[in-house]
Every structure is written in C-alpha cells, then in structure tokens.
Swiss-Prot record:
Miscellaneous remark of the record: Present with 2550 molecules/cell in log phase SD medium.
Function: Required for the accumulation of subunits 1 and 2 of cytochrome c oxidase complex. Thought to play a role in either mitochondrial copper transport or insertion of copper into the active site of COX.
Keywords in alphabetical order: Copper, Membrane, Metal-binding, Mitochondrion, Mitochondrion inner membrane, Transit peptide, Transmembrane, Transmembrane helix
Family per record: Belongs to the SCO1/2 family.
The keyword ATP-binding appears for this protein: no
Name of the protein described by the UniProt record: Protein SCO1, mitochondrial
Residue intervals passing through the bilayer: 76-92
Residues at which Cu cation binds: 148, 152, 239
Length: 295
C-alpha cells in the first residue's frame, strides 16, 4: 500500500483488489485495481473555492464578493441596449429610405403622370436650352410670367428660400428654371432683368409662342391669355402654379403646389434627392441577393 504525503493536495492511491473487513465494512473482490481519490486540505485553502475567471480570489469573511460579477453584468446590459438602439435606428431609417425608393421605382414603371419630354427653348443669355440640359442634375421648374403681380413673385421668393436651405443645410444643389408663359412680352432681356430680383441661380427660359406652348403641353401646364389682345396692351396670363421636380435622368419626380411652405417644401425635396438611385445602381440591386427588398 502506498503512503500519502501530507504536502500534497491531491493523491491517487492504488490498492490491489482484495477482500477487506472491519467495522462491518466489506470490499468486494474485483478484477484489476480500483482508484481512491482524496482531496487533502493544505495551506489554509478551502477546496473547490470559486475564483473569478482571469482574476484572484476576493475574500470577505470567507466569502467571494459579487461586485465584479455585478459590474460585468451592468456593462453587458448597457452595451446590449446601446447596440440595440443603434440597430433599431439604422433599420428604421433604411426602411423609410427603401419605401421611398420603392415608390419611386413604381412611379417609373406605372401610374406616373406623363410629364416632361423633348422641348426647345432659349435661355435669358441667348443660349439654346433643351430637355438634355436637365440630365446629370436635379432640376426644379416653374412656369410663370414677368408681369405677374403677386403669385409669381411670392413663389419665386419661396423658391429662393428652398435653394438657400438645401445648399447650406443639406449640401443639395438644384437647377432652378423659370419658363415664361408669356413669350410675347418676356424676351431674354426682359427675363434677365426680372429675375435679377430673385435668387441668382434661377435661369429664365423663353421662345416662340409655339415653342413655349409645346413645353407647357409636355408638363401639362395650363395657360391662357385674353383674346384679341393688342400690342402694348396690359393683360394677365392665367396659368398653373406648381414646381416640377425632375431627377438627373430628366424624369418627373413630384409636383409641389402652393401648399408647400419653406419647410415642408425642403423636406419633400430632400426626401426625393436622398432616395434617388442612379439607373446603373438600380440594375445591380435587382440582380443582388437582397433584390426582394425592392419588389
């Protein structure tokens, strides 16, 4: 029989199989050997004491403190809440963006008003201006006339506020266009003088009566002048009052009426600009694994 050393905490003792007796206890004969395992208390340490993972025991009247465990749990909860909040914000924002994008996609496919198309006009500097000049940038178009007493000036002032806010707050630049509905009186020089009182980026467009009529027809703009007007006679032109937002592909996006103020108008334009996806990128999205999001 092997002798245990008191300096050891754990010893394996092997005894030959035999029949033992004493104090009424019996050890049945078994084939081979059996192992007896004992824990020996040494150096004042308690067996099976719990020690924090990666740390040292903290003693307080013989008990392990739970402060480190509670602190770790608190940090985990805070991290979980922070990550959860960030993910919730991200997914909600992406959901709104995708919904707007899907709506724009649907408008391209069906149900979109047939607005826009080929036209030929002249700007207030004498340069040719066609629908091709709308490509590559967002444009906003307003139809009016220089002798308009109140509505046109009010709408152009509002457009100036939109342009300033879009540029300074969102870094968005639009191409603002003013197309006259009164080509008989609004020559390039007249438009240049008239628009000098408004935002400097607004470009005036005019043309012959037939050219202006064609442009108005393409955008479904109603306008009329009094019959039998004599040269030099003062008159008013009745016309539709809308801003037409066009995307960089020259496609109609939205029409903003007089109900849009300096804040809601900006919000609507920003929404459309941020949700716009170029044609090449749209084609890639339809082929990607997540294409079901756009259906």
């Amino acid at each position: 029989m092997l002798k245990l050393s008191r300096s050891a905490n754990l010893r394996l003792v092997q005894l030959p199989a035999a029949r033992l007796s004493g104090n009424g206890a019996k050890l049945l004969t078994q084939r081979g050997f059996f192992t007896v395992t004992r824990l020996w208390q040494s150096n004042g340490k308690k067996p099976l004491s719990r020690v924090p993972v990666g740390g040292t025991p903290i003693k307080d009247n013989g008990k392990v403190r739970e402060g480190s465990i509670e602190f770790s749990t608190g940090k985990a909860i805070a991290l979980f809440l922070a990550v959860g909040g960030a993910l919730s914000y991200f997914f909600n924002r992406e959901k709104r963006r995708l919904e707007t994008q899907k709506e724009a996609e649907a408008n391209r496919g069906y149900g979109k008003p047939s607005l826009g198309g080929p036209f030929h006009l002249e700007d207030m500097y004498g340069n040719e201006f066609t629908e091709k000049n709308l490509l590559g940038k967002f444009s906003i178009i307003y139809f009016g006339f220089s002798n308009c007493p109140d509505i046109c000036p009010d709408e152009l002032d509002k457009l100036g506020l939109w342009l300033n806010t879009l540029s300074s707050k969102y870094g968005i630049t639009l191409q603002p266009l003013f197309i006259t509905c009164d080509p008989a009186r609004d020559s390039p020089a007249v438009l240049k003088e008239y628009l000098s009182d408004f935002h400097p980026s607004i470009l005036g467009l005019t043309g012959t009566f037939d050219e202006v009529k064609n442009a108005c027809k393409k955008y479904r703009v109603y306008f009329s002048t009094p019959p039998n007007v004599k040269p030099g006679q003062d008159y008013l032109v009745d016309h539709s009052i809308f801003f037409y937002l066009m995307d960089p592909e020259g496609q109609f996006v939205d029409a903003l009426g007089r109900n849009y103020d300096e804040k809601t108008g900006v919000d609507k334009i920003v929404e459309h600009v941020k949700s716009y996806v170029p044609a090449e990128q749209r084609a890639k999205q339809k082929e990607a694994w997540y294409s079901f999001l756009f259906k």
